[in-house]
């Protein structure tokens, strides 16, 4: 059925790269459609599992044109069906029911009859024949296997879906569901917020998710300053992760176009995806085991499909014709054309695989085991994060983190200080130092001078302090007037360097005060620059004294001749 559809689909479809949604994908798309309708009607993007299963059963009966009189019509079924059809058309995909319907129209006389009836197709999709096909459990349990225990069926299913989604994205770049599974697998820090921003940007530009990523990253890489997206663009904060994702897809496309052998190209693609998924994981990791198993099975199946295509081409005895205009990519590029055929056949077989038995597990499973983060199911990933309000506050952890970030943003970064930064403390700014002004009755012991006083009493006090300091300086070591309790005694034999530092600074300050007062008395202002000192008198003895010293130097033997020779 899928082989006939793939051979004749150019007669009914616009694109030959249309891919098929399997049974599991057909169940996930109605879930998103129902949640979207509930968002429009109730304002909440969500849906119950029972509602999904009820709509799913009615939808299958309605699309297969079976009787559904005993089943009530779900609420807003017309809108849900419209959303479902729009999603398939927008992503360039068809479901199994469409393939089943097209097979009746597209098959030729030499093709086999219908492999399934309509009721069998319904039972296959809805899962009513699972109980009869399910193998019975053995009475005695088998020996427990470490590999089976570590690698659960859920992880195997998720890992294999990621492999097929990467291959699907190479064939059909419009498949948004394939990009959803591959965007953050492996972990690229593109979580819920990044996917929401990407989805909103795609809605604004009316394009697919992959085309939005490609346009944004290419505009930054090749557009230059004038054509690059503005800094306010919502995808600007996810540039690193989006660039990593697009670079990996570019590497896969290079393998697809540069490797002529389809089998070799397919094996290289699968190996590249495996290397990306198992990077940084140990050999006993469940994801590592599932990736190894998926890689082995996919490589074997790619080799078998390539052998089948080769036999069908060579067995006719006729050389293959030139590529037709409608084949694969409308004759735009023939590189990797045969490889794309093999990948499409592989994806068609994956779409015809048995659906998942546990529908609840399928709709609620997440990818946290793959990317190492708090992943979410497909429904929660498509749900836009709501702004916190009074009725729905943030969690305590988020509030604490936001408060810490707010405090960190207010901390003033240390500025570049001068070479005198050692004179003030680290936590204080240079201009915020405290100036201490001692009273006029105390001897100034701080670095900063005391404020100027305009009264004559302060001048008299300064004169008295200067005289006291002078008297103390003139006294000998045995004539200390203040005694040891004052702390102002010093040894006269030590000279100026042995004087206490506070008293020496105070003496210099008082000398400057006296000089300023003398200048004021002579009619000059205090701020007037000081007069230049008169030039020193010339040294006695005449100018010839220095020349005589220079002439008195004796020459070495032969120095005069050598000097005259070099002067010439």
UniProtKB/Swiss-Prot annotation:
Residues 442-555 are annotated as: Disordered. It comes from the Eukaryota. Signal peptide: none annotated. One of its GO terms (cellular component) is nucleus. Its main location: cytoplasm. GO terms for molecular function: DNA binding. InterPro entries: PARPBP. It is found in: Cytoplasm; Nucleus. Residues 515-527 have a biased composition (Basic and acidic residues). Gene3D superfamilies: PCRA, domain 4. Residues 488-500 have a biased composition (Polar residues). Keywords: Cytoplasm, DNA damage, DNA repair, DNA-binding, Nucleus. One of its GO terms (biological process) is negative regulation of double-strand break repair via homologous recombination. Belongs to the PARI family. Required to suppress inappropriate homologous recombination, thereby playing a central role DNA repair and in the maintenance of genomic stability. This is PCNA-interacting partner. It comes from Danio rerio. The gene is parpbp.
């Amino acid at each position: 059925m899928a082989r006939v559809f793939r051979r004749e689909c150019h007669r009914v479809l616009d694109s030959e790269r249309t891919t098929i949604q399997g049974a599991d994908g057909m169940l996930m798309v109605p879930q998103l459609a129902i949640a979207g309708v509930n968002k429009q009607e109730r304002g909440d993007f969500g849906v119950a599992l029972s509602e999904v299963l009820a709509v799913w059963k009615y939808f299958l009966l309605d699309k297969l044109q079976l009787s559904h009189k005993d089943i009530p019509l779900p609420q807003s079924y017309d809108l849900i069906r419209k959303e479902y059809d729009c999603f398939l058309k927008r992503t360039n995909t068809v479901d199994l029911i469409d393939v089943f319907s097209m097979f009746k129209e597209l098959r030729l006389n030499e093709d086999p009859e219908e492999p399934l009836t309509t009721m069998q197709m319904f039972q296959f999709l809805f899962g009513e024949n699972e109980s009869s096909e399910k193998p019975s459990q053995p009475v005695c349990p088998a020996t427990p296997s470490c590999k089976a225990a570590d690698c659960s069926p859920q992880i195997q299913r998720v890992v294999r879906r990621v492999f097929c989604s990467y291959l699907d994205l190479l064939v059909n770049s419009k498949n948004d569901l394939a990009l959803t599974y591959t965007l953050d697998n492996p972990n690229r820090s593109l979580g819920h917020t990044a996917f929401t921003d990407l989805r909103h940007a795609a809605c604004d530009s009316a394009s697919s998710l992959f085309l939005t990523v490609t346009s944004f990253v290419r505009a930054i890489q090749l557009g230059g300053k004038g054509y690059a997206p503005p800094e306010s663009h919502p995808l600007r904060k996810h540039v690193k992760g989006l660039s990593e994702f697009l670079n990996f897809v570019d590497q896969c496309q290079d393998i697809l176009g540069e490797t002529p052998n389809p089998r070799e190209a397919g094996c290289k693609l699968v190996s590249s995806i495996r290397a990306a998924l198992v990077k940084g994981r140990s050999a006993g990791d469940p994801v590592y085991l599932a990736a190894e198993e998926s890689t082995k099975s996919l490589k074997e199946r790619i080799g078998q499909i390539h052998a089948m295509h080769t036999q069908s081409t060579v067995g006719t005895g006729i050389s293959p014709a030139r590529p037709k205009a409608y084949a694969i990519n409308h004759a735009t590029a023939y590189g990797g054309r045969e490889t794309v055929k093999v990948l499409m056949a592989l994806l068609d077989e994956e779409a015809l695989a048995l659906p998942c038995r546990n529908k609840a597990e399928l709709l609620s499973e997440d990818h946290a085991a793959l990317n190492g983060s708090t992943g979410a199911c497909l429904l929660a990933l498509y749900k836009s994060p709501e702004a916190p309000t009074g009725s729905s506050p943030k969690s305590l952890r988020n509030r604490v983190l936001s408060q810490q970030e707010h405090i960190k943003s207010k901390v003033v970064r240390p500025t570049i200080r001068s070479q005198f930064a050692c004179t003030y403390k680290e936590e204080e700014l240079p201009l915020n130092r405290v100036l201490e002004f001692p009273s006029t009755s105390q001897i100034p012991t701080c670095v900063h001078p005391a404020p100027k006083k305009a009264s004559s009493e302060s001048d008299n006090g300064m004169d008295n302090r200067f005289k006291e300091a002078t008297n103390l300086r003139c006294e000998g070591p045995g004539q200390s007037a203040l005694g040891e309790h004052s702390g102002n005694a010093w040894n006269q034999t030590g000279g100026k360097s042995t004087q206490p530092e506070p008293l020496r600074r105070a003496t210099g300050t008082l000398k400057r005060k006296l000089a300023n007062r003398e200048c004021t008395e002579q009619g000059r202002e205090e701020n007037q620059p000081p007069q230049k000192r008169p030039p020193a008198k010339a040294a006695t003895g005449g100018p010839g004294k220095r020349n005589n010293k220079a002439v008195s130097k004796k020459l070495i033997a032969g120095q005069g001749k050598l000097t005259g020779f070099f002067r010439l």
